[in-house]
Design a protein with these regions (language model features):
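Membrane-interface alpha helices of multi-pass inner-membrane proteins
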Residues: 80-94, 124-130
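Membrane-proximal stem/loop segments at transmembrane-domain junctions that anchor or position
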Residues: 142-265
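Membrane-interface anchor segments at the N-terminal boundary of transmembrane helices
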Residues: 9-18, 237-318, 322
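Multi-pass, polyprenyl lipid-linked donor-dependent membrane glycosyltransferases
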Residues: 15-21, 44-71, 89-103, 339-344
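Loop-to-helix entry region of an early transmembrane alpha helix in multi-pass inner-membrane enzymes
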Residues: 1-25
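Perimembrane helix-loop-helix junctions
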Residues: 100-129, 349
Length: 367
């Protein structure tokens, strides 16, 4: 909805222009709320290390996560209801938005004891959920939300036996054929680490694999079975997926071959030519990502003692949001790393706050 008018004016460039304006505005808001003036050079370096320019220019959902969190942080100085509404609109870009709004509300209550931030988080959760329901009803009324299908697909991509067991239990021939297809796909070495084999099955089924029926009748039994049928290997895979986000390999989600049709110009783009899947590009991204980790760790080591209690609580909150983000997507999807990458700018926030020393503490505005 936010892109409708800009898209009519400037076409494709509407997304990077709008995202850039939001991200820049979020940084400015952070400086005003915490009354800091960081070095422009240091700030630019941190922004590059956090891979923020890539996602701001190319991915709507992950670019909006950053300004949404800063808006919620600013609720101590700004009207909490309006802040919550704006943050909720941004977080509604992904189904996990309401979860993280609630996570923020809990952290605000525990760490900051800030009623205003709690209210902002709760309002954001309601708005994000409401917008998702509204958009689904307007745009895809016949398609289920697949809230159970995605985690079910994640577990049977790791353990194809789960899909086979559900096919045997239900007597569903399509599921039986899908189980055979998953087992076949996993025999290829390049698919060993994939957690999204569901889409391969769906594409090759030529419409026989009914998403609505799978969501309603089969996804939940598969999830329940996952906790009973060899849960230890599954738990180990989830834990290793969590650790892989911090490992030396970087996997972007800019796939060269997409399932949905795109304008003709896409097929002449760097993405379609496999630029983002090239080893040199992924290696540079890994170096930058580790630079972001090291900058945050160094700022934490040298700046922790000379910052005020409020900033320390903010840093702890940022760390917990980052862990919650990675834990959620290790559980639900696993690699690629784009969902981990969206917490890198939060580490850049923490670094800026720590190196800014004893910044002026934001005073909560009267209710």
């Amino acid at each position: 909805l936010l892109l409708t008018l800009p898209y009519k004016l400037v076409g494709y460039w509407a997304m990077p222009i709008l995202n850039s304006a939001m991200v820049a505005g979020a940084w400015i808001l952070l400086f005003r709320v915490y009354d800091i003036r960081p070095s422009r050079l240091v700030l630019c370096i941190l922004i590059v290390l956090s891979l923020q320019p890539i996602y701001t220019s190319a991915v709507l959902v992950d670019a909006w996560f950053f300004p949404a969190i800063i808006l919620l942080l600013s609720a101590r100085r700004l009207p909490e209801v309006y802040v919550g509404i704006l943050a909720g609109l941004l977080l509604s870009g992904h189904g996990s938005g309401q979860i993280f709004a609630l996570v923020f509300a809990v952290l605000a209550a525990v760490l900051f004891r800030s009623r205003r931030q709690v209210v902002a988080g709760m309002v954001a959760a309601v708005i994000a959920f409401g917008m998702n329901v509204l958009l689904d009803a307007m745009i895809m009324p016949e398609t289920p939300r697949l809230s159970k299908t995605f985690p079910a697909a994640r577990v049977f991509s790791v353990q194809p036996e789960l899909l086979r067991r559900e096919a045997d239990r239900s007597g569903n021939l399509v599921l039986s054929e899908a189980a055979d297809e998953v087992a076949r796909i996993k025999t290829y070495p390049e698919n060993k680490g994939r957690r999204d084999l569901f889409w391969d099955v769906w594409k090759t089924s030529e419409g026989e694999f009914d998403l609505a029926k799978f969501e309603e009748h089969h996804a939940l039994p598969i999830l329940k079975d996952a906790f009973m049928f060899e849960p230890v290997p599954l738990a180990r895979t989830i834990f290793l997926d969590f650790l892989s986000y911090y490992g030396p390999a970087t996997q972007f989600d800019f796939q060269p071959v997409l399932s949905e049709p795109f304008p003709e110009r896409f097929y002449a783009s760097h993405q379609a030519k496999g630029f983002f899947a090239a080893v040199p590009v992924e290696s540079v991204a890994t170096i930058l990502r580790y630079g972001c980790y090291l900058a945050f760790a160094a700022a934490l080591f040298f700046g922790w003692r000379r910052t005020g209690a409020d900033i320390r609580r903010t840093i702890i909150g940022i760390g917990l949001i980052a862990i919650a983000n990675d834990a959620l997507f290790a559980l639900l999807s696993g690699p690629p790393d784009r969902y981990h990458h969206r917490i890198l700018p939060l580490l850049a926030i923490g670094t800026v706050l720590l190196i800014s020393g004893r910044v002026k503490q934001p005073v909560e505005a009267p209710a």
